[in-house]
Amino acid sequence: VSRLDASGLFYTDLFSREEGLVSLLLVANPYSYKTMIDGMDRLVLAVFRQAPDRETEHWMWCETRILVLRVTVEQLERSLAGDDSPGLVQWLAHGDILLDSDGYLRALKERLETWGANLKERKLLCEFSQFAKTYLQSKQDLKDGQILDAYSHILASLHHWAHIALIEEGMHPELTVWVQMRNVNPGIYKLYEELTTNQETVEQRVQLVILACEFSVFTKMKSSCTLLLRLIGTRTEGWTVSELMHHPELEGLKLDLSLLLQKLAKKGYLREIAKPHREIGLGILELRYASAIERAE
C-alpha cells in the first residue's frame, strides 16, 4: 500500500475537488468489518449537503479495491436513527476523518458516543416497531401452520429485542450482537439458544419464544415509544397518521406507524378521536390520535 493511500492524501486530493463536500471518511483497515464494505479493501464515505450525481462507485487503484459512497447529511442522519446500515456506527468508530469542513463528522461521532439529540429515542422506536411487527408475523405464521416462516420471523424478532436491550444500556448493536448479549442480557441470550439449539420440535421452540416476546412487547412498549408519545402529546386535538408520518422527527424512519398507533391505543397510552371527514364521504370518520391524559376538544 502506497504512502499516499496510507495517509489518505490520495483520497483527499480527489474528493476536495467535488463541489459541496462537507466531510470525508476513510475506512482503510476493515479487518473483521470487511463484510460491511461489501468485500472491498477500502471504504470512502463522502458527505455532501446536496444529493450527489453518483451515489455508489467501485474503484481500483494499485490493486486496491475501493468502495465509494456519497451521501447527504440528511441521508446519514436517517441511516443512523433507523439503523438502515448496520455497519455505519463501526465505520464512524474505526474510520479516519480526512476532511471535515465544519466539524460535522466529529460532532456526529461525539453524538454517537453520548447518544445526543434524541438518537436513543429514535433508535428505540425503530427497533421496537420491527420487534412488534416480526413477533406478530411469527404468531400469525404459527396459526397458519407455517412453522418455518414462524421460526424465521421470531428469530428476527429476537434480534430486534436484543438491539433494544443493548440500546437501553447505552450500547450500539454490532454485527456480533449475540456476543454482546451474552454479557449484557443472559436472559435474551438464553432464549436465542433455546430457539436455535434446543432438542424440542421447531414448533415448540417457536411457541416458547413467542410467549416471551409477547410479554416483552407489552412491558417495553411505553419506554420504547417515548418519542412518539411525546410528539402526540403536543396537540390536544390529536394527529392523523399522515401528519405523524411527515413530522420532521419521524419522517424517513423505518416505522410501521399504523401498527404502533393501534397497539398504543389498545394499551391505553393513546386515545383514538373519530371526527367526521366530509371530503372523504358522508358517514366516514377520520381517526386522530391524542394523548391519553388530555381531553378532546
Regions found by a protein language model. Give the residues of each.
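Conserved nucleotidyltransferase catalytic core and NTase-mimicking acidic/glycine-rich helix/loop elements
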Residues: 122-272, 294-297
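Charged, low-complexity, helix/coiled-coil-prone segments
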Residues: 27-36, 68-79, 91-105, 167-175, ...
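Metal-dependent nucleotidyltransferase catalytic core
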Residues: 1-94
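Short, amphipathic alpha-helical interaction segments positioned at domain boundaries
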Residues: 281-297
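Short charge-dense sequence patches
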Residues: 40, 57-58, 76-89, 101-114, ...
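General structural signal for secondary-structure boundaries
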Residues: 1-6, 72-75, 116-117, 200-205, ...
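Short Lys/Arg-enriched helix C-cap and helix-to-coil transition segments
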Residues: 273-277
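Conserved NTP/Mg2+-binding pocket subregion across the NTase superfamily
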Residues: 3-5, 62-144
